[in-house]
Amino acid sequence: MNFLRKIVKTCRDEDTQKPPLVSAPPDDDDLWLPPPEYIPLKEITGKKNMRNFCVNGEVKVCGPNGYSFRTLRHILRSFDEIYSGNQRMIGLVKVVVGLALSGAPVPEGMNWVYKLRRTLIFQWADSRGPLEGEELEYSQEITWDDDTEFVGLEIRVSARQCHIQGRIWCINMNSRACQFWSDMSLQTQRSEEDKDSSVLLE
């Protein structure tokens, strides 16, 4: 029986280093209200510390018995403690992960794959964000497991500064992306140059 359980819970053949585990979600995990600091973006008028990034994001969800967004949101609440990438680009990664998971998944074996490929405009507060010309290649696995459910996330994000026309990254304060950003504690503040945009503090 234990052998069968191991097969059902394994998403990949190779047994690599075990990713970090996240504790069980509380019963009230689905209660959520959009945080007031998230402002729908229109057109960014300020030029201060603003950069376009060509981003590729992929979130692969392994849930052999299915999965719920309640569980995904609970996993992402521990993102700051688990994140192993470049700290100067953690805000960018949170934006990309939230947008990717807001899209439609494509089934791939026992997994569901969410992908995002886009040019996005990011604006950071003074002395925040990546260095000029800095690129990102980030990959990490996170799992959540108890006696009734197993869910694994495999996150990949790549980003490089580019000069292609970018898009704003939050147009609806009630969108699922904003919900994930709230779960990941995305740190933003209202831009001093443009009241309709937010700048990243991370």
UniProtKB/Swiss-Prot annotation:
Keywords for the protein's UniProt record, in alphabetical order = Host cytoplasm, Host membrane, Host-virus interaction, Membrane, Phosphoprotein, Viral budding, Viral budding via the host ESCRT complexes, Viral envelope protein, Viral matrix protein, Viral release from host cell, Virion
Region of interest (Essential for glycoprotein binding), ranges: 115-151
What is the superkingdom listed in this entry's lineage? Answer: Viruses
Bilayer topology annotation: Peripheral membrane protein
What does the entry list under GO cellular component?
A: host cell cytoplasm; host cell endomembrane system; membrane; viral envelope; virion membrane
Note whether Phosphoprotein occurs among the keywords.
yes
**What is the role of this chain?**
Plays a major role in assembly, budding and uncoating of virion after membrane fusion. Completely covers the ribonucleoprotein coil and keep it in condensed bullet-shaped form. Inhibits viral transcription and stimulates replication. Plays a major role in early induction of TRAIL-mediated apoptosis in infected neurons. Inhibits the integrated stress response (ISR) in the infected cell by blocking the formation of stress granules.
The protein's name in its UniProt record: Matrix protein
